[in-house]
């Protein structure tokens, strides 16, 4: 099994004698011109998250029909979006570059061979210099502290394109997919209209799950998570998820179990992700053994009592041990619309945080 780049990947190892290692200063003050950043769905109110999802869906239908909304036309003209990626990427890179171009901007890709946060110069220096030359930074990094420090010292908006703790762009795309699938076309309420829906996550507790759980709490969607023992959601993350539901009239409930059948009971959507992420190569055999019985199959859905018209989602790349071909390529699968929606989610995020300077109404 080839480990994927989504969760907790380690930075490329560099000989100590070859470079000087720096860490970002904790004594330096935050920029007085601090813009608004998107580091996690926890940074958004329920209304803001709803707006980002709805805008993503609306822009999708407008642009695909050949009508680019007036407020988007050339909205990033003359602006450069720096894409600082220390992890390899397919969907995130393509969607971010495509979104920037759609808005008339110039995407500048800086891979791990071009720039490494905290290597050769401090992260503070990198943040200050890069943000002085571009209009936004989209960062795909290892530790959450890296993107948090980058945002702390940047004078332009920073959008988290993945770290070991969160993946907000994926969450926007996921809920756009759910919204387009489950919300009636005649829906005119202020919410996404997903209250009472149930998602079952079967697999590893990772960054994609964490932002999905925060989103679910804000949207009134119940989320049942089944992981093997020892792979549960960390206590600190559970607290953040619970916090996300505060102030919501009917917040989504978070349920944890070690039994997949319990999670999928009465579920409308079954979701999984990679079992072995980059940085976990040495754990591969251990993880494969631990996750036996956690493959999503039609039989699992039937045994657990998933709702009759249940759907399946996966953020990709997918490996066959995570979900059967029968489910992955069936009419229950939303994986390819979900992948496409990464583009529209990126457009919505750039509009909200760069074009509109964080004013999301």
Curated annotation (Swiss-Prot):
InterPro entries reported for this sequence: Asp/Orn_carbamoyltranf_P-bd, Asp/Orn_carbamoylTrfase, Asp/Orn_carbamoylTrfase_sf, Asp_carbamoyltransf_Asp/Orn-bd, Orn/put_carbamltrans
Keywords: Amino-acid biosynthesis, Arginine biosynthesis, Mitochondrion, Transferase, Transit peptide
Reaction catalysed by this enzyme: carbamoyl phosphate + L-ornithine = L-citrulline + phosphate + H(+)
GO MF entry, a single one: amino acid binding
Transit peptide as recorded in UniProt: 1-24
Biological processes, Gene Ontology terms: arginine biosynthetic process via ornithine; citrulline biosynthetic process; L-arginine biosynthetic process
Protein's cellular compartments: Mitochondrion matrix
Pathway given in the UniProt record: Amino-acid biosynthesis; L-arginine biosynthesis; L-arginine from L-ornithine and carbamoyl phosphate: step 1/3
Residues that coordinate or bind carbamoyl phosphate: 89-92, 140, 167, 170, 315-316, 342
PROSITE patterns: CARBAMOYLTRANSFERASE
Positions of transmembrane segments: none
Pfam families: OTCace (PF00185), OTCace_N (PF02729)
EC number: 2.1.3.3
Cellular component, GO, one term: cytosol
Main location per the UniProt record: mitochondrion
Sites where the protein binds L-ornithine: 207, 273, 277-278
Active-site residue list: 315
Family: Belongs to the aspartate/ornithine carbamoyltransferase superfamily. OTCase family.
SUBUNIT field: Homotrimer.
NCBIfam families: orni_carb_tr, PRK00779.1
Designated name of the protein: Ornithine carbamoyltransferase, mitochondrial
């Amino acid at each position: 099994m080839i480990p994927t780049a989504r969760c907790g990947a380690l930075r490329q190892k560099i000989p100590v004698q070859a470079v000087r290692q720096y860490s970002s200063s904790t004594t330096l003050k935050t920029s007085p011109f601090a813009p608004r950043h998107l580091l996690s769905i926890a940074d958004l109110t329920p209304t803001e998250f709803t707006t980002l999802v709805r805008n993503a869906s609306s822009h999708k239908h407008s642009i695909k029909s050949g009508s680019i909304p007036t407020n988007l036309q050339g909205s990033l003209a003359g602006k450069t979006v720096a894409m600082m990626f220390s992890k390899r990427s397919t969907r995130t890179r393509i969607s971010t570059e495509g979104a920037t171009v759609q808005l008339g901007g110039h995407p500048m890709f800086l891979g791990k061979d071009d720039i490494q946060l905290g290597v050769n110069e401090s992260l503070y220096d990198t943040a200050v210099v890069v943000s002085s030359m571009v209009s936004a930074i989209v960062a795909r990094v290892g530790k959450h502290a890296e993107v948090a420090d980058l945002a702390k010292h940047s004078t332009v908006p920073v959008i988290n394109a993945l770290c070991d703790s969160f993946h907000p762009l994926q969450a926007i795309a996921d809920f756009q997919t759910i919204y387009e699938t489950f919300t009636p076309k005649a829906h005119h309420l202020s919410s996404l209209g997903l209250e009472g829906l149930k998602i079952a996550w079967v697999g590893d507790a990772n960054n994609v799950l964490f932002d999905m759980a925060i989103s679910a709490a804000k949207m009134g969607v119940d989320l049942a998570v089944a992981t093997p023992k020892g792979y549960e959601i960390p206590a600190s993350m559970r607290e953040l998820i619970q916090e996300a539901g505060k102030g919501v009239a009917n917040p989504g409930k978070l349920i944890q179990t070690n039994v997949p059948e319990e999670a999928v009971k009465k579920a409308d959507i079954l979701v999984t992700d990679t079992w072995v992420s980059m940085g976990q190569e040495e754990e591969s055999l251990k993880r494969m053994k631990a996750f036996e019985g956690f493959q999503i199959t039609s039989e699992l859905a039937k045994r657990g009592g998933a709702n009759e018209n249940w759907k399946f989602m996966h953020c990709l790349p997918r490996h066959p041990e995570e979900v059967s071909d029968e489910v992955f390529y069936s009419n229950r699968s939303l994986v390819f619309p979900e992948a496409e929606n990464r583009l529209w989610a990126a457009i919505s995020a750039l509009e909200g945080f760069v074009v509109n300077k964080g004013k999301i109404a």
